[in-house]
Amino acid sequence: MPHFSMHIREEALDGTVEPKLISALTDAVAAVYGEEFGRLVGVDLIGVPQHRRGIGGVPSETDAPLVTLSMREAAYHLPEVPDAPARLVRATTDALAGVLGEDVREQIIVTIVGVPDGRTGVAGTVA
């Protein structure tokens, strides 16, 4: 299951932006893998109070989203989805800039994590 964890300044989460972010991140994966894949996407939005996030050794005044997408490693190497990691980084960045504004684009960090077979589980069973 594709799973996003997004850390963003708490103040950017105002009760209206959260559904937009969840939808946009889901759509980013669906744009790469297809609409059916989108229904599997999980999203966690994690608000970080402004005084608890720093860049360059000082507290940050910017939203600076840090996004991690994790799913099984094999999904990044499917022949029918060439250049999947690059496409996911691009689609995720575009999605976030679309919701948060273009001025945030240069600060968006996207990390793609591949989980090896046998390293995840569902309901107590290795999947």
Predicted regions and their residues:
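A domain-level signal for the structural core that forms small-molecule/cofactor-binding pockets
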Residues: 1-127
